[in-house]
UniProtKB/Swiss-Prot annotation:
Compartments it resides in: Cytoplasm
Organism listed in the record: Rhizobium etli (strain ATCC 51251 / DSM 11541 / JCM 21823 / NBRC 15573 / CFN 42)
Keyword Nuclease listed: no
Any one GO molecular function term: UTP diphosphatase activity
Marked site positions, Important for substrate specificity: 15, 80, 163
Keywords: Cytoplasm, Hydrolase, Nucleotide metabolism
One GO term describing the cellular component: cytoplasm
Coiled coil spans: none
Source species taxonomy: Bacteria, Pseudomonadati, Pseudomonadota, Alphaproteobacteria, Hyphomicrobiales
Keyword Transmembrane: no
Protein name listed in UniProt: dTTP/UTP pyrophosphatase
EC identifiers of the protein: 3.6.1.9
Major site of localization recorded for this protein: cytoplasm
Active site positions: 79
Length: 206
């Protein structure tokens, strides 16, 4: 029988948990890492996603150091960045920030980058960056006003979650949908299985 290694998800995102559950994976532990997500001067959005996903994984690894309960476990982290050109749209915490982001996204293409980072049981670090191109329709003031009132923009990169009401704003998308949600499922499973994590024996039997 294949060994069922433990998987630590260095995130508290319900969306990422749901996506892993969709693939039949139940993380053994959730470890949201509180790191400084401020972009460095002139940092490219792709580079930011790569750096932050690595920093989250490394912080989780440091947090379990010396704890034999988690010896030999996998650590998975992810960070999603939304950008118009090189302009990074952070996680909106206030309505005026969300309003600014929505005006910028309205009628334009933008890119969503998710960096995924996997720490293997022998402590190798593997990374992958996934990019999706998204185009919003031109938003009316009425749509923006009602979306802001919904509160669904809070804490979201680019002030929106595609799996919620803002999904109605998407005119066109090229690339992974799950990447925009927050965890590119195909690439994540590829990364896990490529490093010996047994995904498929965890699938339920009918």
């Amino acid at each position: 029988m294949a060994l069922k290694y433990k998987l630590i998800l260095a995130s508290g995102s319900p969306r990422r948990v749901d996506l892993l559950n969709q693939a039949g994976i139940e993380p053994s532990r959730l470890m949201p890492m509180d790191i400084d997500e401020t972009p460095k001067k002139s940092e490219h959005p792709r580079s930011l996603a790569r750096r932050l996903s690595a920093e989250k994984a490394e912080a989780a690894l440091a947090a379990i150091k010396g704890d034999i309960t988690w010896k030999g476990s996998y650590i998975l982290s992810a960070d999603t960045v939304v950008a118009v050109g090189r302009r990074i749209l952070g996680k909106a915490e206030f309505a005026d920030e969300a309003l600014s982001s929505l005006h910028l996204l309205s009628g334009r293409n933008h890119l969503v980058y998710t960096g995924i980072c996997l720490v293997t049981p022998d402590r190798k670090i593997r990374q992958k960056i996934v990019e999706t191109k998204v185009r919003f329709k031109r938003l009316s003031g009425f749509e923006i006003e009602n979306y802001l009132a919904s509160g669904q923009w809070r804490g979201k990169a680019g002030a929106y979650g595609i799996q919620g009401l803002a999904g109605t704003f998407v005119q066109k998308m090229v690339g992974s949908y799950t990447n925009v949600v927050g965890l590119p499922l195909y690439e994540t499973i590829l990364l896990l299985t490529g490093e010996g994590f047994d995904v498929h024996s965890r699938w339920p039997e009918g």
